[in-house]
Design a protein with these regions (language model features):
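A short Gly-Trp-Pro
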Residues: 1-21, 26-149
Length: 149
């Protein structure tokens, strides 16, 4: 069995221009990630159930390369974001929304949909979305899911 070197992991870091897609390839996109961009983990019910790490980006750093007709969407009850899924394979690829606490309009991409990024290379920050506690900002340790910190 071949050993995996750190060089391989380092060459698949989450920075620069990256392409992403759903499982079947019907949805494709491109993003620009600044060096040092951290992934976000949220404890809201949707993020908890999808176990997603995302990158929060300004809308101009995201380009959808396929037609919107390939997508289905879901809007959460508090209407701060719209989540987009592939109509064919069901993978949630990205979301769009507006939240003043994260800088206004944003696109949130599913980091696991990036085609050439090693998921273990992503350093995460944590948000308390379950308690609508955006004003506290992110932190380096996970927020509790069932109790408020």
């Amino acid at each position: 069995m071949e050993s995996t070197s750190n060089t391989q992991t380092n060459s698949h870091r989450a920075e620069g221009k990256q392409r992403g897609s759903c499982h079947c390839g019907a949805v494709q996109f491109e993003v620009d990630l600044a060096p040092g961009t951290k992934g976000s983990r949220c404890n809201c019910s949707v993020c908890t159930k999808t176990a997603m790490t995302s990158f929060l980006l300004k809308p101009d750093a995201f380009r959808l390369l396929t037609l919107e007709s390939a997508l289905s969407s879901y809007e959460q009850g508090y209407k701060t974001s719209q989540r987009y899924f592939c109509k064919t394979c069901g993978v949630q690829c990205f979301g769009r929304g507006h939240l003043a606490e994260v800088g206004g309009d944003y696109v949130s991409i599913n980091a696991n949909c990036l085609d050439d990024v090693e998921p273990t290379s992503i350093e995460a920050i944590y948000w308390d979305g379950r308690h609508d506690n955006w004003q506290s900002g992110p932190r380096d340790a996970p927020w509790p899911t069932f109790t408020q910190a």
